[in-house]
Amino acid sequence: MLNQFSRTQLIFGAEGMERLYRARVAVFGIGGVGGYTVEALARSGVGTLDLIDDDRVCLTNVNRQIFATRKTVGQYKVNVAQARILEINPDAVVHTYKTFYSPQTAEQFDFTQYDYVVDAIDTVTGKLALVEQAERAGVPIISSMGAGNKVDPTAFEVADIYETSVCPLARVMRQELRKRGIRRLKVVYSKEPALTPIDDMTISCRAHCICPPGTARKCTQRRQVPGSNAFVPPAVGLILAGEVVKDLTGFQRGE
C-alpha cells in the first residue's frame, strides 16, 4: 500500500523498512550535525529515536541547525526535535533527555536498548565515553569528527578512525582510543584543513554572548567558538544517517 515511506521502500525493500521501523537509534548531540541526522532518520522510518542534548536553541544556531528558527530560540533542542519528528511521522516513538552526556552522566543510559548509537557531540571526553559504553554493550556506533571551520562538504568521507588523517579531532581520538584498547570505530571525517576564524570582536560570542536564559554551558565558557555555515554540518549529519540506515537494513549496492 502506498505510504509516506514508499519511495524509500523502493531502495531498501519491505524487509528493510520493517527493520527500520523496529529499530531504536540514540543520537547524542542535536546540533548542526546531529539535528540533520535525526531529521533523516525520522524521514527514513526509524521507529524509535532517543535524543540526548541539554542545550537550548540560540540565535547563533539559526545559521546551520535544522531545528533552530527565530521562533524556537530559547526552547530545548530535544523538545523542538521531538515535535518535528512527530509531525513527520506520528507513529514514531521519541525519548528525550535534557542531559549533557559525559563520563559522569553515562550511567543514566542503558545502551543495551539501542540498535545503533550516533555520536554528534563536541567534547573529546564525551566521545570517548560514548565509544567505550557502546563497545561494552556491543552496539554499533558511528562518530562525527570535526565539522567546524570548514567549507567543503564534499571532502567528508566514511572511514575507520585508524585510517583517518589531517583532522585534529580524529588524531586525538585515535590516540585516546588506542590507549583504551578500542580497535575500530566508524567515523565521518574530512581531510580539509580547518580554517582560522576571523578575529572580529564585534561578532565574538565570547565578547557578546547571547545564549538564552537557562543555558547550562554558555559561549563565554568555551575555549574557542568555531566558525560554521549552512552547508557543512548538514552534509556530515546526512552522511551519518545514511550509514545508520544502510547498516540497519543490511543494504549492499548491487543486491
Specify the residue positions occupied by each region the protein language model found.
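N-terminal charged helix/coil linker that caps or initiates catalytic domains
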Residues: 1-26
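Glycine-rich phosphate-binding loop and adjoining beta1-alpha1-beta2 segment
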Residues: 46, 51-89
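Hydrophobic/small residue at the entry helix of a nucleotide-binding pocket
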Residues: 33-34
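Conserved SAM/SAH-binding loop
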Residues: 98-106
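Conserved N-terminal Rossmann-fold NAD(P)-binding element of oxidoreductases
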Residues: 27-29, 52
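Glycine-rich phosphate/adenylate-binding loop
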Residues: 2, 112-113, 121, 126, ...
